Amino acid sequence: MGVQSVESEASAMNLIPNAPGLSPNYWCTWSTQNFGREDEHPDYHNYLGGVGSQFARAEMNEKNLRRWLQQFPKIRGDLYLMLDDGWDVPYGVHPDKSRDRFGTLELDEERFPSFTGTPAQRLKKLNDFVKESGWRGLGLWVPAQAAGPIEKGPAMEAYWTERLLWCKEAGVEYWKVDWGTYAHDVEYRLFLTQLASKLYPQLIVEHAYCMIAYNGSQ
């Protein structure tokens, strides 16, 4: 076999598998919420910290989701589409003044008007829509807290039991647990993981640890 023949055969190889993989992987919307907007802010400070987060949350809606779903046509069957921060709160709600509004796990009706019904039904309709668009399924950003003045104990367990059962009914298979009142509370994160394992073992619970940049000298 000549060199030209080998090169031709190699260039024709397709290394992307035909069937979706079993290992969990996702594409997260957060960077696109920040940098995929149609408007442009020349001042980079508009992309940082709380200000940047406010702009990013404003981009979380059904119109943009329908556009995001068209990405990665060759590989999205392997990927969950991870809805990041902003999907379960109304427009204009931010943690600097309304932290206790986050964590409802109820798809905001103004942001996603086409997906109606009970909280579980809304999530299922959205998850089905994501799958019909060629993705592996829907993933959800979840804060390390409950919405409202709910303390640890039976009330907290009842709160998350209800939401885990919503996701089970909806077929949502991935949570990314991020910032929140209990972001740095290992016991709280363990509680969520163990409760999910008990009630909905098919759910993958990822824990994102929130911290400032680390440069190796501190």
Question: Language-model segments: what does each one mean?
Answer:
Residues I75-Q218:
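Aromatic- and carboxylate-enriched substrate-binding clefts and catalytic-loop regions
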